[in-house]
UniProtKB/Swiss-Prot annotation:
Its EC number is 2.1.1.199. It is an enzyme of class 2 (transferase). Pfam families: Methyltransf_5 (PF01795). It comes from Pseudomonas syringae pv. tomato (strain ATCC BAA-871 / DC3000). The keyword rRNA processing applies. Keywords: Cytoplasm, Methyltransferase, rRNA processing, S-adenosyl-L-methionine, Transferase. The keyword Cell membrane does not apply. This is Ribosomal RNA small subunit methyltransferase H. Specifically methylates the N4 position of cytidine in position 1402 (C1402) of 16S rRNA. One of its GO terms (molecular function) is rRNA (cytosine-N4-)-methyltransferase activity. It comes from the Bacteria. It is found in: Cytoplasm. One of its GO terms (biological process) is rRNA base methylation. It catalyses: cytidine(1402) in 16S rRNA + S-adenosyl-L-methionine = N(4)-methylcytidine(1402) in 16S rRNA + S-adenosyl-L-homocysteine + H(+).
Amino acid sequence: MNSGFTHITVLLEEAVEALAVRADGCYLDGTFGRGGHSRLILNHLGPDGRLLGFDKDPQAIATGQALAAEDGRFVIVQRSFAELGSQAQELGLAGKVSGILLDLGVSSPQLDDPERGFSFMNDGPLDMRMDPTRGVSAAEFIASAPAEEIARVFKEYGEERFAKRMANAVVQRREIQPFERTADLAEVLKVANPAWEKGKNPATRAFQGLRIHVNNELGDLEAGLEAAMESLEVGGRLVVISFHSLEDRIVKLFMRKLAKGEADNMPRNLPIQYKAFEPKIKIHGKAQFASDVETKANPRSRSAVMRVAEKLR
């Protein structure tokens, strides 16, 4: 399926290099998207290598199915990467996966297609679901949630300073007419935001908060990180690319905790086995960012942060 919307894979070479792909290894691409990372991983795999892709988006699944038809080493499943642990168990891969890649956030085709309802730049139905067949849409949430809950979503997930004021404006307007279109909501948020940031649409943070809430992105990330560590073999690598501070903070703290060993997180008066002092992972290098060349070619890569960890035990 060709949706007509292109996607430029961020940190393509860097992410696959960080995975240290073995020809006979088994790898998971937790965010298949349009398959940029997956195709390069397959190029590094030999005949006995395997790659399993995950995505919730039906258009991504269609692209993945076409790739699977071309290459028998690849399989795609329509699931969140938060479920990769159970999928690995079903396939007998628990503790046997050589590397896992998570490229977080929303893809360019999702943002650029007005019918998906992610963007305030192009008018479309107010949806925002990665999988439009499941869960509550942004319009349904906005229509029924109390002002306090809407404000919490804007503030907690969008880091919006004027969350309460903007949520009240949304509730007042919905009493007159429900929100069905992205441009309609964006206009109300724009008027309610008293302090516009230079170069940024005043609805940006609120839209981010809504999208994260509708798709349970942070909850999925926390579950996916835990599942990834259980699924990896010793020596296997986890590569995560995040696109905003909330995601990156979760990834950074998760990796730091495991790099210190569990004993660092336990009360000092408990009898603790020596093994608890041993780190579970090794963090490879510092956070990596897109190069100047990449950010000029793809401005959306400016906010990308990549972190890499290797499982030790």
